[in-house]
Amino acid sequence: MSIHIAAQQGEIADKILLPGDPLRAKFIAENFLDDAVCFNEVRNMFGYTGTYKGHCVSVMGTGMGMPSISIYARELIVDYGVKKLIRVGTAGSLNEEVHVRELVLAQAAATNSNIVRNDWPQYDFPQIASFDLLDKAYHIAKELGMTTHVGNVLSSDVFYSNYFEKNIELGKWGVKAVEMEAAALYYLAAQYHVDALAIMTISDSLVNPDEDTTAEERQNTFTDMMKVGLETLIAE
């Protein structure tokens, strides 16, 4: 057991999907995994291990924001030996070419957080995805016929930002979307020498306000990213 995860050693696979919403973790376990067993209910942050196409895979919620995902990802890596971590979550489009329900693979993550500067005050350390996972996910998504964008995202510490126009401006610099977790996940992956990737479904748009989705849709219908994430985890 770790501080926030109740699993025993051996109950968590070395490859895992990380949705922010614990109910999305439950949905993935019930709809994609065979023989799924719940290994964590602490703080209702559900985690499950099962098989996908014969491969042992886990899925666990992380909550919202970089502090929350940092807790769970670090414990999964350090205490349970997880080697491949793929975030599957939602994001808001910052780019007029990126639309609701399309996928974004975060090649890198800019951030307004001090999560890196706390360790490296003299550097702007780049938070980047594992190229191996990114390459596999891109080709899998293309083979499945999914509209997929690859590029930078903004990982924000603030959901209700007072710098809305500044965020929009980033879209003009090629930033695809804004979310709240990828930079922290990538930083931990670099620190502990594991592979990480963030796959997001666009749930709303900051540049096209008429494009949005319901809370139920966000929880239960964004299955493309789940398929891509699982296929990427088991790809050789």
From Swiss-Prot:
<feature type="binding site" description="in other chain">
    <location>
        <begin position="203"/>
        <end position="204"/>
    </location>
    <ligand>
        <name>a purine D-ribonucleoside</name>
    </ligand>
</feature>
<dbReference type="GO" id="GO:0005829">
    <property type="term" value="C:cytosol"/>
</dbReference>
<keyword id="KW-0328">Glycosyltransferase</keyword>
<feature type="binding site" description="in other chain">
    <location>
        <position position="20"/>
    </location>
    <ligand>
        <name>phosphate</name>
    </ligand>
</feature>
<dbReference type="GO" id="GO:0004731">
    <property type="term" value="F:purine-nucleoside phosphorylase activity"/>
</dbReference>
<comment type="subunit">
    <text>Homohexamer; trimer of homodimers.</text>
</comment>
<feature type="binding site" description="in other chain">
    <location>
        <begin position="87"/>
        <end position="90"/>
    </location>
    <ligand>
        <name>phosphate</name>
    </ligand>
</feature>
<feature type="active site" description="Proton donor">
    <location>
        <position position="204"/>
    </location>
</feature>
<feature type="binding site" description="in other chain">
    <location>
        <position position="24"/>
    </location>
    <ligand>
        <name>phosphate</name>
    </ligand>
</feature>
<keyword id="KW-0808">Transferase</keyword>
<dbReference type="Pfam" id="PF01048">
    <property type="entry name" value="PNP_UDP_1"/>
</dbReference>
<feature type="binding site" description="in other chain">
    <location>
        <begin position="179"/>
        <end position="181"/>
    </location>
    <ligand>
        <name>a purine D-ribonucleoside</name>
    </ligand>
</feature>
<dbReference type="GO" id="GO:0006152">
    <property type="term" value="P:purine nucleoside catabolic process"/>
</dbReference>
<dbReference type="InterPro" id="IPR018016">
    <property type="entry name" value="Nucleoside_phosphorylase_CS"/>
</dbReference>
<dbReference type="InterPro" id="IPR035994">
    <property type="entry name" value="Nucleoside_phosphorylase_sf"/>
</dbReference>
<comment type="similarity">
    <text>Belongs to the PNP/UDP phosphorylase family.</text>
</comment>
<feature type="binding site">
    <location>
        <position position="43"/>
    </location>
    <ligand>
        <name>phosphate</name>
    </ligand>
</feature>
<feature type="site" description="Important for catalytic activity">
    <location>
        <position position="218"/>
    </location>
</feature>
<protein>
    <recommendedName>
        <fullName>Purine nucleoside phosphorylase DeoD-type</fullName>
        <ecNumber>2.4.2.1</ecNumber>
    </recommendedName>
</protein>
<dbReference type="InterPro" id="IPR004402">
    <property type="entry name" value="DeoD-type"/>
</dbReference>
<comment type="function">
    <text>Catalyzes the reversible phosphorolytic breakdown of the N-glycosidic bond in the beta-(deoxy)ribonucleoside molecules, with the formation of the corresponding free purine bases and pentose-1-phosphate.</text>
</comment>
<feature type="binding site">
    <location>
        <position position="4"/>
    </location>
    <ligand>
        <name>a purine D-ribonucleoside</name>
    </ligand>
</feature>
<dbReference type="InterPro" id="IPR000845">
    <property type="entry name" value="Nucleoside_phosphorylase_d"/>
</dbReference>
